[in-house]
Amino acid sequence: MAVQQRRSSKHRRDKRRSHDALAVNLINVCKHCGKFKRAHRACSCGMYNELRITKAK
């Protein structure tokens, strides 16, 4: 097992952990049906950017 030779400072520890944050999911409201949808994805009603992409489920 690896054992550290010196104690790491808070600054080095925090710099290492700077990329560990969870990504925030952007949520928008569909202009066509009013349901919540994730950004840059088609809604469940079949609309994307006011264009019909698929048939409604």
From Swiss-Prot:
Which one of the record's GO molecular function terms can you name?
Answer: structural constituent of ribosome
One biological process GO term for this chain? translation
What is the source species?
A: Mycoplasmoides gallisepticum (strain R(low / passage 15 / clone 2)) (Mycoplasma gallisepticum)
Cellular component GO terms, alphabetical: large ribosomal subunit
InterPro entries linked: Ribosomal_bL32, Ribosomal_bL32_bact, Ribosomal_zn-bd
Question: Which family is annotated?
Answer: Belongs to the bacterial ribosomal protein bL32 family.
Write the signal peptide boundaries. Answer: none
Q: Where are the transmembrane segments?
A: none
Descriptive protein name: Large ribosomal subunit protein bL32
